């Protein structure tokens, strides 16, 4: 009884610590989201500056791009409101602060260029090149972190037969082994799929409504695995049902992620092709008619007809919005060429990340299934 009380006390202390750290965690999470969207923001900004837009007009347009930049559009809106209050856009940029020191430095650099009265497009282009390199490095580090977590979880699952043999030899209970193994499998699966292009995928409202159900199932698996207040561990059939539910609920999101990755490849090829044709003197409408890539042809048709596009990838969303600006302003292919470069770098960074984590996704599903089958032996 005293053992259970000690566990409850430790859980309460851990909960208090987590609640105290929650504001810091939320701030760091927002900073990470801003840094992930920074290359898209700079590319979006540069394309419009190259098309002859003023910096204020480009920021106002960015503030309206909620789907393309879920975090950065709010910062752009705050900058515009601060500039209106002060009557000075460059001053607002110079003094603006964000949760990310890197994003704050970039905005200040743009503000310095605007303060001098020079065209900020060149400075934005240089900043964009730096951010493309940084985004690729960040994707590599995220893959390594996820791999480390996945390897630790896999080690636990690999040692499960040893745990079984050890406890059986000494006459111990096997009750804790299977919940630990299943939770380890869930951890590995989460680590592998959570980073597969999600920052540049636009999930539909239908899939977003499924995410709370997935979190509820994971919370249920954790809750029934903690032996508090004398609560006995559940039958393995419950874990089997939870695992099946997670797999079933992940199917729609996995389908949209695969579609988004396919759109990303078609998106940067589309931008490169159109930029080349425009630089060679092809009319914009004629260039649209020459697009034959099935991954993007429907979205291009929508843009050409003035219908709102609905891409699953933020990268393709960026390309399509730039195409629309180029078409309306007649800016030529240079702006589109820079956006094509950004789109290509984003695609390759997250494609490599996805391929490295796919192995752990498959292993975690297989291991979790095998362990649940073993529980009936």
Listing of model-derived features with the role each one plays in the protein:
Residues 1, 9-21, 131, 135-194, ...:
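Bilayer-spanning, highly hydrophobic alpha-helical transmembrane segments
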Residues 4, 90-97, 167-180, 232-236, ...:
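Membrane-interfacial helix-loop-helix connectors in multipass membrane proteins
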Residues 116-144, 318, 326-348:
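Membrane-proximal, non-transmembrane alpha-helical segments
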Residues 124, 190-203:
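Juxtamembrane segments at transmembrane-helix boundaries
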Residues 8-97, 105, 205-308, 318-321, ...:
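Juxtamembrane/interface alpha-helical elements of multi-pass membrane proteins
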Residues 315:
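Catalytic core of the metallo-beta-lactamase
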Residues 126-127, 164-167, 284:
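P-loop NTPase catalytic cores that bind/hydrolyze ATP
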């Amino acid at each position: 009884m005293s053992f259970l009380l000690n566990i409850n006390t430790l859980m309460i202390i851990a909960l208090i610590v987590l609640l105290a750290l929650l504001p810091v965690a939320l701030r760091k999470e927002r900073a990470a989201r801003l840094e992930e969207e920074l290359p898209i923001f700079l590319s979006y900004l540069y394309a419009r500056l190259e098309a002859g837009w003023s910096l204020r007009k480009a920021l106002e347009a960015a503030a309206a791009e909620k789907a393309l930049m879920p975090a950065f559009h709010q910062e752009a809106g705050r900058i515009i409101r601060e500039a209106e209050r002060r009557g000075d856009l460059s001053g607002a940029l110079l003094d603006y602060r964000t949760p990310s020191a890197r994003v704050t430095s970039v905005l200040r650099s743009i503000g310095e260029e605007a303060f001098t009265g020079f065209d900020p497009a060149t400075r934005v282009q240089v900043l964009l090149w730096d951010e493309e390199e940084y985004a690729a490095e960040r994707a590599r580090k995220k893959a390594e972190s996820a791999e480390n977590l996945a390897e630790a979880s896999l080690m636990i699952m690999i040692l499960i037969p040893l745990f079984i043999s050890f406890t059986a030899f000494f006459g111990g209970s096997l009750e804790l082994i299977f919940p630990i193994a299943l939770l380890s499998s869930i951890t590995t699966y989460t680590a592998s799929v959570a980073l597969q292009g999600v920052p540049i995928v636009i999930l539909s409202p239908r899939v977003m409504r499924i995410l709370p159900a997935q979190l509820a199932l994971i919370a249920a698996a954790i809750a029934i695995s903690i032996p508090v207040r004398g609560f006995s561990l559940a039958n393995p059939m419950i874990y089997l049902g939870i695992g099946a539910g997670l797999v079933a609920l992940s199917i729609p999101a996995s389908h949209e992620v695969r579609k988004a990755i396919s759109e990303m490849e078609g998106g940067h090829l589309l931008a490169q092709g159109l930029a080349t044709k425009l630089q060679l003197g092809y009319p914009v409408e004629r260039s649209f008619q020459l697009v034959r890539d099935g991954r993007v042809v429907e979205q291009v048709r929508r843009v050409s007809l003035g219908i709102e596009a609905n891409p699953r990838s933020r990268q393709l969303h960026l390309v399509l919005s730039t195409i629309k600006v180029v078409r309306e302003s007649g800016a030529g292919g240079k702006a589109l060429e820079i956006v094509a470069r950004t789109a290509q770098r984003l695609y390759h960074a997250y494609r490599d990340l996805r391929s490295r984590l796919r192995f752990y996704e498959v292993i975690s599903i297989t291991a979790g299934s095998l362990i649940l089958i073993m529980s009936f032996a």
